[in-house]
Every structure is written in structure tokens, then in C-alpha cells.
């Protein structure tokens, strides 16, 4: 499924530090299973885990050159991977990170008709209606707001509580927070 005869790499994966193994493997494993190679830019804040995981993959028998790990800052190593799109050397970019960088990657991919997967900072709402089980809603809101210190794209961004249950919900929620 190559759009460029010169393309040696199917996918470039640039991921954030908050889920340094799960997110890239969600994308790379299917690409590898389909016979493609990947360049993986490790998060600059957590490069050692990426290195250890790539090493384990090689030790398990994955041939050299299937996963190619790159370390460095986004403005250096990451930019190099994005520049490869303009050069016709890559067929897919997967990026997890900021909306600002995601917009730039989307623009580069769009003008080159290269597929991209962008997981950017979300503002996920939780809507609590009068028919809700308030104990479950409180538990969900608590985990969504504070689980993993809010460092994930699925963190609770907006809590919307129906006015008819607002006081009861907030009393239970604040008791859990304290």
C-alpha cells in the first residue's frame, strides 16, 4: 500500500510520554502485522522505556529494520520525521501530543495526501443526568479528573451536571475528592 516507489518506511510514530508503550503499540503492531516497517520517535521525557521495549521486540525475533527507534526533541528528531513526508519517504504518520503540533503535522500530511492519525489534547465531557446512578457518576468523574493525574487525552475536561441533581452530586463528589 505504498504511494511512493521510493518509500521504505510505511509509518512514522511520534508519541507522548504519558503512555509510552500502549499508544505506539496500538498503531505499530497492526502496521507490522501487515508487513510494514515503522520509525518510532520516543517521547523526549521517557526515552528509556521505548528503548527497552524496542530491544525486547528485537530479542523476541523481530528482524532488524522493522522497528527503528529515534530519540530526541520534537523540534529536531520529530521534525525530521515530518520532513520525510514532504520528501515522499513515508506513507503514514501517527502523532499523539499537542494540538499545535498536530495541526502542523496534519497540514504537511494533507498537502502530500499522506494518511495521518492525530490524537490531540481532548476536552472530554461527562454529562450527569437525573436518571444516573450518582455513586457511579461520582466514581467516574473522580477517575476521569484525577486518574493518572489527568495526563491523558481521555481525561475529564468538562463536568456537566443537571441542575436537579447538582447539589447532591457535588456533595458526594467533593467528599470523595477530600
Give the ranges of each region predicted by the language model.
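Single conserved hydrophobic/aromatic residue that forms the stacking wall/gate
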Residues: 1-10
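Small-residue (primarily alanine) positions within well-ordered alpha-helices
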Residues: 5-6, 31, 50, 109, ...
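Buried hydrophobic positions in well-ordered alpha/beta secondary-structure cores of metabolic enzymes
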Residues: 11-14, 31, 35, 67, ...
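PLP-dependent aminotransferase-like
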Residues: 13, 24-78
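Conserved AMP-binding
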Residues: 16-18, 98
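Generic hydrophobic/aromatic pocket-lining and core-packing "Φ" positions
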Residues: 28-29, 78, 82, 102, ...
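ALDH superfamily catalytic-core signature
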Residues: 61, 98-178
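A structured beta-alpha segment of the ubiquitous adenosine-cofactor-binding alpha/beta core
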Residues: 68-94, 98
Amino acid at each position: 500500500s505504498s504511494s511512493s516507489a521510493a518509500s521504505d518506511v510505511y509509518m512514522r510514530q511520534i508519541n507522548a510520554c504519558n503512555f509510552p508503550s500502549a499508544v505506539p503499540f496500538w498503531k505499530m503492531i497492526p502496521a507490522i502485522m501487515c508487513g510494514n516497517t515503522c520509525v518510532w520517535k520516543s517521547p523526549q521525557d521517557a526515552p528509556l522505556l521505548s528503548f527497552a521495549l524496542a530491544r525486547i521486540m528485537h530479542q523476541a525475533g523481530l528482524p532488524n529494520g522493522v522497528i527503528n527507534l529515534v530519540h530526541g526533541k520534537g523540534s529536531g528528531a520529530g521534525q525530521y520525521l515530518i520532513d520525510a513526508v514532504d520528501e515522499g519517504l513515508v506513507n503514514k504518520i501517527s502523532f499523539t501530543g499537542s494540538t499545535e503540533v498536530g495541526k502542523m503535522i496534519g497540514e504537511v500530511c494533507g498537502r502530500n495526501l499522506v494518511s495521518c492519525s492525530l490524537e490531540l489534547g481532548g476536552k472530554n465531557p461527562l454529562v450527569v443526568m437525573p436518571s444516573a446512578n450518582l455513586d457511579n457518576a461520582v466514581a467516574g468523574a473522580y477517575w476521569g479528573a484525577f486518574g493518572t493525574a489527568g495526563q491523558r487525552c481521555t481525561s475529564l475536561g468538562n463536568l456537566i451536571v443537571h441542575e436537579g441533581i447538582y447539589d447532591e452530586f457535588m456533595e458526594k463528589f467533593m467528599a470523595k475528592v477530600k
